[in-house]
Amino acid sequence: NIIKMPEGPEVKIVVDYLNKSLKNKKISSFSHCSKPYKIKYGEVIKSLKEYVPLDFTGFFCIGKTSFLKIDKRKYFSFHLGMTGKWSEKKEKHTHFKIETSDNTKIYFTDPRRFGNIKIVSKDQLDKDYYKEGDFLNYNTPIKKYAEYLVNNLKSEQEVCKILLNQKYFSGVGNYLK
C-alpha cells in the first residue's frame, strides 16, 4: 500500500514501486475495474489497448504527474489525486489495472476518485510539464532557482507562494504552509 494525500516525494515513491514491480516485464493489458472508470476513461483505456503488448520501459514523474512512454510521441499518464495508490491487491475502490504477460497485476485504487488517467502527446508533455523544476528527477540548476527566488522575494510575496509555483518547484504542495 502506498501513501495517502500524495505530494511530490510520495509520487516519486509510487513511481519507484511501479518501476520495481514491472521491471523487465511486458504489459499485456490495461483495463478498468469499475463502472465509473469505464464511463469516464473508456476512450483512454480503449486507446491504451492499441499499444499492447508493450515492453515496460519505466515510469517517470514530473511533480505530481507520472508518465509511461507508450510510443515515440505518446505517454500514458496518471495523477493520484488525493487518495490514489497502486498495489498488488484489488480493493473496494480499485478502478484500473495493468497486467503483464507473466500475470503480474498492479491495481490503481482511488476511494475519492480525484485521480485520473490520460494519454498525453510529447508536445503536450513538453508544453505543460516543466521537467527542470522537478527536484526529484533531474539535475537542478541551483543558480537558476536562487535567482528566481531572489527576484520574487523582492516583490514581497510570501515565501510559501513562491515555493508553491509548480512551474519552478514541481511537486511541492500545501504541506509547506
Task: Name what the model sees in each region.
Residues 70-72, 76-172, 176-177:
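Phosphate/anion-contacting hairpin/loop surfaces
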